[in-house]
């Protein structure tokens, strides 16, 4: 099926420089669906299961097992990346509307659109 905003995929983020999240890990697709359909690249945020709890306002913790992502996984919206679609592997699942509301707010914080976070 077609890739959509709010889907998660495994992606190969190697090679890594410095503090970037790396390896083969899940990422959340954040690019709009027109871009997902036509662009050779995609905007994504890495997901980690090793953090335990969110540490920054740009972190969103999944409070349930979300279609293949483990409960307690944290989406790192301060580490947005534009990656080539060839880095994507299999689809993991999709987030629901309430989770996407949290994502939207944290994304606003990350890019300076949220009130008080410029």
Task: Enumerate the predicted regions with their spans.
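Short, small-residue-biased leader/transition segments that mark boundaries at the very start
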Residues: 1-5
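Conserved functional hotspots at enzyme active or ligand-binding sites that engage polyanionic ligands
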Residues: 6-118
């Amino acid at each position: 099926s077609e890739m959509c905003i709010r889907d998660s995929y495994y992606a190969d983020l190697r090679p890594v420089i410095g503090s970037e999240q790396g390896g083969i890990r899940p990422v959340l697709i954040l690019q709009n669906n027109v871009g997902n359909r036509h662009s050779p690249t995609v905007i994504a945020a890495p997901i980690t299961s090793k953090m335990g709890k969110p540490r920054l306002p740009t972190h969103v913790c999944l409070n349930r097992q979300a279609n293949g992502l483990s409960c307690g996984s944290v989406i790192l919206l301060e580490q947005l990346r534009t990656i080539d679609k060839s880095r994507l592997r299999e689809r993991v699942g999709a987030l629901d509307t309430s989770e996407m509301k949290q994502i939207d707010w944290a994304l606003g914080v990350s890019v300076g659109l949220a009130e008080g976070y410029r």
